[in-house]
Amino acid sequence: MEFLKNQNLFSFVYNGRNVWDCDMKKTVRENGEETVTELIFPDGLKVTNVVKKHGENAYEWVNWFENTGKNPTGIISELWDCDCVAPFERDEKKGYTAYEPDRDKVMKVYAPNGSVWSAYEFYADPDLVDGSNFLPYHLTPDQPHQCYQNRGGRSSDLRAPFFNIKREDKGVIFAIGWTGQWRCELDRTDEGVRIRTKIEDTNFRLLPGEKIRTSSVVIMPYTGSVADAQNQWRRLVKQDFSLIGKPGRDDAGIFCAGIWGGMSDAGVKSRIQKIEEYKIPIEDVWMDAGWYGRGNLEWSECGGDWIPNAE
């Protein structure tokens, strides 16, 4: 993926300045299918970007932040773990028109719904006409910006963290690797599409010795139809990311019983006893959401506060 070699891949603001304008030492090491970029700042902040090449012409990267100094770091904000441009042919600006663009030529964004408690869960319609945001899944010079995010700190609530940008027979699929609140912004440029993804509202500093990683991204360019691209993506996930069938892992998923986390202790124990009593061939018991928070009706507001509900 040549376009990655000439880009910084991520961005953030450090103590009010664009990171790439700050005083720092940058080193790049290549080791086979992996490239490691390190940024060392005078105050001891160390940023490590690790890029791995996968099958199906895909790349993955993740950022690590570490305080190697003796004092707290400066403030890290506006952190975009992915900030790159995917090359696409230029589109001419056409100005206002009462007609929809040519559906066979316009750039489309397949951005599936997440869990929305409806018949449209994980459904993507790039030609949807929304009265409040006309064609929210098209990217054109006249409508160059689109923004997507999830809800409630749950990675696939309202919006799933998977995207497919396609123009005619060329496209790119990418996914955000984060289990909390994320944000994705797309901008049509003369050179292509600027893709930015991040953990929403980052604003933090690191104490001496602290080290964290932030969200990851996997990006896969393709040529051909949407169906071909989706199958290419499935092969990538199965071969490089799924644990099923890998050394030390079973060839199939476990057969489990799902129990609502808001159920009382007595209710949970009763069901486990019934499983044992009737020798139901369950391999595992899986506890769903609701075991945390202040009450059964408030579980959705307490994601991230993993304090068990004593009731």
Language-model region placement:
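Short acidic, Pro/Gly- and aromatic-enriched capping/linker segments at domain boundaries
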Residues: 188-207
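Short, intrinsically disordered, charge-balanced linker/junction segments flanking boundaries
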Residues: 186-190, 308-311
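Catalytic cores of glycan-processing enzymes that make or break glycosidic bonds
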Residues: 12-13, 60-81, 213-218, 251-259, ...
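Terminal connector regions
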Residues: 220-254
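Polysaccharide-binding surfaces and accessory modules of carbohydrate-active proteins
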Residues: 1-186, 200
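Short, flexible loop/turn elements at secondary-structure junctions
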Residues: 55, 69, 178, 199, ...
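Short Pro-Gly-centered flexible turn/kink motifs
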Residues: 204-223
